[in-house]
Design a protein with these regions (language model features):
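Residue-level signal for inorganic ion chemistry
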Residues: 35, 54, 105, 130, ...
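Well-ordered beta-strand positions
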Residues: 49, 148, 192-193
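Short, acidic/turn-prone active-site loops that include or flank metal/cofactor-
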Residues: 55-58, 154-157, 176-179, 201
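ATP-dependent small-molecule kinase phosphotransfer cores
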Residues: 55-128
């Protein structure tokens, strides 16, 4: 029997999307071993929301992660550990020497990472958001999602020493990873602000303190300009 009420009723209007408050976003980046995580933790201690795209990538490639079915379908079952998580060592071997395979992996991960990070940004309550993207400068449009770029910088010799100490990788392996990233000069050329992370923690904290105050002012100014443009990002 046909339900004439349903058949003749006007289509239901979709629920309105929740209001998303525009956020002033600082893109945090730096080379491997530069100390991005330490800097991010300093900002978190000040109550700033930090969204780490590396952390999101680990979450979606853990056992049961939303990215794993597509990854296994594209690369085969040997890229997964017995519990269903991504075998990171195996995947590194596949994508490091083959740009096509790397692009394939990125085509799976990047849309998911972006969707999750955008959702988390929309829920942030802090005056501004720190969006940690290790390969921000290497992306095609580094300023597409951020209003300000903060680079964590240190000498390349310091990077190598730190990564070897924490990971056990050989010096040659660390250098090969660094060679696949933007150069120190390329990152600094794109930076709106720089944290020099080759001193002690007190020096690092002092730099964060100063930048935090500056970012609060910039975020307030930007938000006021955004409001005057009807909620759109100011030019």
């Amino acid at each position: 029997m046909t339900n004439t009420l349903d058949a003749n009723a006007a289509p239901a209007k979709p629920d309105p999307e929740p209001t998303r408050v525009k956020r002033w976003i600082v893109g945090l980046t730096g080379g491997i071993g530069s100390g991005k995580s330490t800097v991010a933790a300093c900002f978190q201690e000040k109550g700033i929301t930090v969204i780490d795209t590396d952390d999101i990538a680990h979450r979606i490639t853990a056992a049961g992660g939303v990215a794993m079915p597509a990854i296994i379908s594209s690369f085969g079952g040997d890229v997964a550990t017995p519990d269903g998580a991504l075998n990171r060592q195996r995947m590194r071997e596949i994508v490091f020497e083959d740009p096509r395979q790397r692009k394939k992996l990125e085509s799976i991960l990047h849309p998911m990472i972006r969707e999750i990070s955008e959702r988390e940004i929309s829920l942030a309550a802090s005056a501004y958001v720190l969006l940690a993207i290790p390969l921000l400068i290497e992306s095609d449009h580094p300023r597409e999602r951020v209003q300000h770029i903060l680079v964590v910088d240190c000498p390349e010799a310091t990077q190598i020493e730190r990564v070897m100490k924490r990971s056990g990788l050989s010096e040659e392996r660390v250098k090969s990873i660094m060679a696949a990233q933007a150069t120190r000069e390329q990152r600094l050329a794109q930076a709106d602000a720089v944290i020099s992370n080759h001193g002690n923690l007190a020096d690092l904290q002092a730099q964060v303190d100063s930048l935090h105050e500056d970012f609060l002012t910039k975020a307030e100014t930007w938000f006021g300009a955004s409001a005057s443009h009807g909620g759109q990002s100011p030019p």
